[in-house]
Amino acid sequence: MEIRDNNKVNLCFAFDNLRKELSRPYGILFTNNKLFLDFVSKSIQQGFKVITVGDYVSRVLEENGIIPFLEVIDGKTKRSIPQRTIVKNKEYRVTNEAGKIRFEIFEIMENILKDRDGGVVFVNGEEDLLVIPVTLSADNGDIVIYGQPNAGAVVIIVNEMIRWRVRDILEKAVVKEC
């Protein structure tokens, strides 16, 4: 399914001025896969949703028998194209430019996360910054996972404090035409 409303304003949040701030992990950085997988498994057992942003972290979980509630991927890992083996019941397609977040993606992620089925969001462009709208839309206690290049996996446990931090980052972003 393609999610697109051509009547919407073509605006984005741009983060060029925040590259350094966004390059640090904003959650728990796991460098040990066993500890990471144990933590994720326990979160699922407690009834929380697992949401991944990035192809590599999604694939690591899948290869270890953990299927995220929602995966946000662009089909590339460090700009190379890996093979996908897991197919979900619900697939969505969005467009998002590198270093930006389209305004419409906030509403799209909120609607997808309200759905009981989750799925996979294929991003035409780049998914890295979509951690922001996903974190704002996830429920308290859900975990959002993204890769920290050459370091490990970052796990954000969603709560009001982390949402406040995300909103603070958004306030510093520059609004531009996409």
Swiss-Prot record:
Q: Which UniProt keywords apply?
A: Coenzyme A biosynthesis, GTP-binding, Kinase, Nucleotide-binding, Transferase
Q: Which residues bind GTP?
A: 55, 57, 74, 76, 127
Pathway linked to the protein: Cofactor biosynthesis; coenzyme A biosynthesis
Top-level EC class = transferase
Q: Does the keyword Transport apply?
A: no
The keyword Transferase is annotated on this UniProt entry: yes
Give the top-rank taxon of the lineage listed in the UniProt record for this protein.
Answer: Archaea
Matching InterPro entries: GTP-dep_dephospho-CoA_kin (IPR007164)
Catalyzed reactions: 3'-dephospho-CoA + GTP = GDP + CoA + H(+)
Q: What is its EC number?
A: 2.7.1.237
Disulfide bond sites: none
Q: Which Pfam families match?
A: DUF359 (PF04019)
The biological process GO terms on file are: coenzyme A biosynthetic process
Output the Gene Ontology terms for molecular function: GTP binding; kinase activity
Per the similarity annotation, which family is this? Belongs to the GTP-dependent DPCK family.
- Quote the function comment for this protein: Catalyzes the GTP-dependent phosphorylation of the 3'-hydroxyl group of dephosphocoenzyme A to form coenzyme A (CoA).
Supply the name of the protein: GTP-dependent dephospho-CoA kinase
Q: Per the UniProt entry, what species is this protein from, by scientific name?
A: Saccharolobus islandicus (strain L.S.2.15 / Lassen #1)
Q: What is the lineage of its organism?
A: Archaea, Thermoproteota, Thermoprotei, Sulfolobales, Sulfolobaceae
